[in-house]
UniProtKB/Swiss-Prot annotation:
Zn(2+) binds at residues 114, 118, 124. Single strand-specific metallo-endoribonuclease involved in late-stage 70S ribosome quality control and in maturation of the 3' terminus of the 16S rRNA. Binds 1 zinc ion. GO terms for molecular function: metalloendopeptidase activity; RNA endonuclease activity; zinc ion binding. HAMAP family: Endoribonucl_YbeY. This is Endoribonuclease YbeY. GO terms for cellular component: cytoplasm. It is an enzyme of class 3 (hydrolase). Its main location: cytoplasm. It is found in: Cytoplasm. Its cofactor is Zn(2+). PROSITE patterns: UPF0054.
Amino acid sequence: MSQVILDLQVACEDTTGLPDEAQFQTWLNAVVPQFQEESEVTVRLVDEAESHDLNLTYRGMDKPTNVLSFPFEAPPGIDMPLLGDLIICRQVVEREAREQEKPLEAHWAHMVVHGSLHLLGYDHIEDDEAEEMEGIETEIMLALGFDDPYIAEKA
């Protein structure tokens, strides 16, 4: 299986307790090579202000969010392995993990898996799309040794 080329950018003021590059690499490699042979992904870890600005600019949502996915679309006739960018907000991920009573590492992994599937074209707007995407996420999370991230919703 091929490895994803990772460009990790840390733009958080406080970097204490963030997952390391090897963890992000493991999580990306659990997703992307199943769907695409050669890929490059940028993962940018940000604080709430940057997440809020990007979420407002690109989604019209006036708040920070856990993960934003920006797929790269190469111009016609140009073949590039760049899959896109994931922007992950440290504070939102940490808050959600506490609120949902999930291990922090598992929630970080879930955000990478979830965001990567968006880069690959998956979505969860329609119920059938959500069911398919959540099923893939669950399989990958279990393969990584984490619990089903949607177990509370299924109870």
